[in-house]
Swiss-Prot record:
The gene is infA. Its main location: cytoplasm. This is Translation initiation factor IF-1. GO terms for cellular component: cytosol. It is found in: Cytoplasm. The lineage of its organism: Bacteria, Pseudomonadati, Bacteroidota, Bacteroidia, Bacteroidales. The keyword rRNA processing does not apply.
Length: 72
């Protein structure tokens, strides 16, 4: 069975939680918890509350996600 593709949406960081987790408000109004992707962590990209980010979510659990891009 083929793996379903991830859902990508834009959002804004609302607050920083512990262990590099963030609360993100998506454009549609939902709030999810998200962690930083490995490449962003590897390149020391810092994320602060108020930053606009792109979040990748699994179609199986829409309450969690992974931050894959920070807009400038």
């Amino acid at each position: 069975m083929a793996k379903q593709s991830a859902i990508e949406q834009d959002g804004v960081i609302v607050e920083a939680l512990s262990n590099a987790m963030f609360r993100v408000e998506l454009e549609n109004g939902h709030e999810i918890t998200a962690h930083i992707s490995g490449k962003m962590r590897m390149h020391y990209i810092k994320i602060l509350p108020g930053d606009k980010v792109r979040v990748e979510m699994s179609p199986y659990d829409l309450s969690k996600g992974r931050i894959v891009f920070r807009y400038k």
